[in-house]
Amino acid sequence: MIVPARWFAGGKGLDAFRDEMLHDTSLRVIHDYPNADDCFSGVQIKGGITYFLWDRDHKGDCSVYTHQNGEITGPVTRPLLEPGCDTFIRYNEGVTIYRKVIEHHEPTMERIVSSRKPFGLSTTFHGRKTAQHGDVKVFENQGVSYARRSEIPSNTELIDQYKIFIPRSSSGSDAFPHPILGKPFIGKPGTACSETYIVIGPFENEDVCKNVITYIHTKFMRTLAMFKKVTQSTTKALYTFVPIQDFTHGWTDSMLYEKYGITDEEITFIDSMIQPMEGESKEDAYV
């Protein structure tokens, strides 16, 4: 049976189906196509496709094949669920990285990431183009506008704190390497955002925000987010596997590779999947 692969980690209304599938020890083989074009030329199905073999006489781990860019990785025989995980990690190379990270038993970033619509403002919100005294600067899908504090429906305590805004949607392409996340930028005191963004934080000051952004820029961090990403939506759930670091200083990939014991083979996998994140932040563009 060939089906969209969104059920691996997301998909509206698929929680019960995913739970049943991942606890079914009769799933003997899974063939995964992260990019549907590798199976059906010219067809784009967000999150890719998969087909599987269910064998009532089989009770045990599943043999997983990944088809990407004309090449097949696998089979790797492994459990469908890793410890502490309620979704399927689709990349065989990613399982060893995940296992190394969870050995550290660190709190993860979904604790400090907002749900959608962090200030209660929808994507259709458009404030005034010129600021009046006491207005809040609102980052929205057409740039920047201004609103009275009384017009901000929720989480008003975040307005006057340092935080990070990051787009709620990223590139819709399933081709790799991929950025996975949109570019983050600092939300200084006096700012809010529409549903176009989600919020990370709050943080003590601007320096801490800058250090968090160095972490988001790393390929390692975005690889961990990728394990939960099956559509272009970048929700709070993507940060479930991303450990919180010591943000009194910045981070680089080399620092993280050393901390978690990432091998050269795993680094090659990361480089093949994740694009560098470079360029001017949106905040800089609007200053």
Question: Can you describe what each PLM-predicted range is?
Answer:
Residues 37-266:
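C-terminal substrate-recognition regions of SAM-dependent nucleic acid methyltransferases
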Residues 8-9, 172-175, 277:
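Flexible loop/turn segments at secondary-structure boundaries
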Residues 1-38, 50-52, 212:
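Conserved Class I SAM-dependent methyltransferase catalytic core
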